[in-house]
Amino acid sequence: MVAFTIRRLFEAAIVMLTVALLAFVLFRFVGDPVNQMVGQDTSLEDRLRLRQELGLNDPVAVQFARFVADAARFDFGISYQMKQPVTAIISERAPATIELALVAALFAVGLGIPMGVYTGIHRESWLSKVFLSVSLIGVSLPTFLIGIFLIYVFAVKLGVLPSFGRGEVVRLGFWNTGLLTASGLKALILPAITLGLFQMTLVTRLVRAEMLEVLRTDYIKFARARGLTWRAINFGHALKNTLVPVITVIGLQLGAVIAFAIITETVFQWPGMGLMFIQAVQNADIPVMAAYLLLVAFLFVLINFLVDLIYVRVDPRIRIYGRGV
């Protein structure tokens, strides 16, 4: 287990260094940072002094080492557009994205697993066909179209839910949350459904496929021959073995939910990191773009690492393999 953990940490460090190199190239070579920070009437002397202060005259290797060291301390410089530390901007926007992603993930898992189990056990029932139809729609339609449709129905026609914004938020130390207010909860419903629907359909179809495969195995037939109850067979044996690959997919999809919340946040004008990234692209705010890239990569690596640890606990074969290599 220790060797497995060390190997995964080493692989995670390699991934982060690679992403840091890409972010540095974006930061260093996509336009001149000085031109982004000063106006056209700035004198040449001031420009040269600013380049010296920013360390842009240093060798590229020195600049990259400094960039990695600063990123390790969560210091991403100053935003060109907002003239504020990028870390402060991300700290202000991150709670909105994290809450949206977690609620969307709970929606996807909370509905996807039961629907997948039901459609796997009751293949010919009418409700199973309804669930499969919903999953097909969720996979087929693009996220922005789902969001626009939900806004049209529930905000424009029915007027029961807000179409944009986060609602009222409450400050809890460094964290601002909308989960403790009625308007915040109402504002979260449509974006969470929009973001989580595609993930829910993936979980549903994966659980169904795994259930169908497991129910055909010999040990399930043996369990039936022993006279075990329907509940013990389907939930004690079949579902338990189904969840091994599902855990991996759910973990990776949680990272995808955070990374690809950009579209949902843009449609609903949700004040999170995704909308921040879009605004940074529009304004060529390179420090914010580089910080977002590094942060998303870090979240992917962290989630993948935690999933690997859970996977080792769930599936003993991984531990055996790890000792053999």
List PLM regions with ranges:
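Membrane-interfacial helix-loop-helix junctions in multi-pass membrane proteins
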Residues: 52-60, 77-86, 168-188, 281-287
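An internal, D/E-rich "acidic patch" concept
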Residues: 57-113
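Alpha-helical transmembrane segments of integral membrane proteins
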Residues: 2-4, 16, 94-127, 175-325
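Membrane-embedded alpha-helical segments of multi-pass transporters/permeases
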Residues: 16, 20, 24-28, 144, ...
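Residue-level signal for discrete positions within transmembrane alpha-helices
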Residues: 12, 93, 97, 133-140, ...
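Short hydrophobic, aromatic-rich alpha-helical segments embedded in or entering the lipid bilayer
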Residues: 44-74, 220, 269-280
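Membrane-water interface segments at transmembrane-helix boundaries in multipass membrane proteins
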Residues: 133-141, 145-200
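Hydrophobic alpha-helical transmembrane segments of membrane transport/permease proteins
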Residues: 15-65, 154-180
